[in-house]
Amino acid sequence: MRKRPGRKPAFTRRQVIDATLAEGIGSFTLRAVAERLGVKATALYREFSSRQELQLAAISAIAADIEPDPQLCTWQDVLRDVVDRQWQMCVRYPEAAAVIVTRPEAFGVALPRITAIVERLAALGIPGGKEGAAFALDFAGDTALETYMSVQPYMTCDEEGRTGLDKFVRIAGELPELFGMQDMGERGNLDLKIEFIIAGMEHGLF
């Protein structure tokens, strides 16, 4: 559907994006977004031609959240910072991880910011130059997203107040604890996984 011409809407694109994020970047409906703004759903078409365009605009907006601290001066710290910011983004917008992983277009709209991070990692001397930087960032980013999605069921409470981890412990009983599930915390083993990636890059395994 083409964007509709006519009177200037009583809201901004950013307000529509913020309403979308509040509704849930994966599950939002145009009607629910419009209701948050106090307008009819058809009014949104003056700014966005489709739900898909709005969703991708929201992804593009939150991609800014992963930009690392400009004061960091080693590629290792930049990579850690990007992962930390990516995790915080997922906590802030719980549906974002699944959208990013399952929508190739989402990676596309975030690519300019991702490219800038790759160039910074390369400039700071990550082994392998830009290719090594792209590999490490992709590996670490995927690890953060997948860890977030896999940990959530263990942290979420059911109607009786039991978490998925509580249920796991009850079923596992006295079996050996090989994966650190009971002590994984809200980030799982993410930090250890990222240090593993960094160590691999430092040792020239790329």
Where do the language-model regions lie?
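Amphipathic alpha-helical interaction segments
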Residues: Q15, D81, P112, A116, ...
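Short, basic, alpha-helical segments at the C-terminal edge of helix-turn-helix-like DNA-binding modules
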Residues: I59-I66
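Short alpha-helical scaffolding segments that buttress acidic/His motifs in well-ordered protein cores
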Residues: A58, V83-Q86, I100, A136-A140, ...
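Hydrophobic alpha-helical connector segments
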Residues: E67-P112
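Short, amphipathic alpha-helix enriched in basic
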Residues: R2-A32, R36, S60
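Amphipathic alpha-helical packing segments from all-alpha helical-bundle domains
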Residues: V101-F135, L145, C157, G161-I171
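HTH DNA-binding helix-turn interface
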Residues: E23-I25, G38-V39, Y45-Q55, E95
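C-terminal peripheral helix-coil segments that are non-catalytic and often amphipathic
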Residues: P153-F206
